[in-house]
C-alpha cells in the first residue's frame, strides 16, 4: 500500500493539481488525487489496526508500531497542509515521514516474518 501511495502522489506531483490543469489532464489528476486520498485513509485505518493488534507483542515492537502510526498521521497531516497551503516544506515533511513509515513497517514485517 505504501508503494502505491507513493506512486499516486508522484503522479499528482508530476501532472499537477486539478486546479492547475484543464481537459483530460484535469480529469486524470483528479482521479489520481482521489485515489491518493482514499489510500491515505486506508493507511490510517491500517495503522490504527496494527496498533490495536500489537497488544501481545513486546514493548520494543509495540513502540515500533506506534512510531509507524505516528509517521502515517504526520504524513497525512503534512499532505493536507501541502495541498491547502502550497508550501514545499509540507511536501518535504510528507516525504520524510512517508520514508520513515516505510522503513518502520518494513522492519516490523521482517521481524514478525522471522518469528
Language-model segments: what does each one mean?
Residues 1-115:
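Polytopic transmembrane helical bundles with strong interfacial aromatic enrichment
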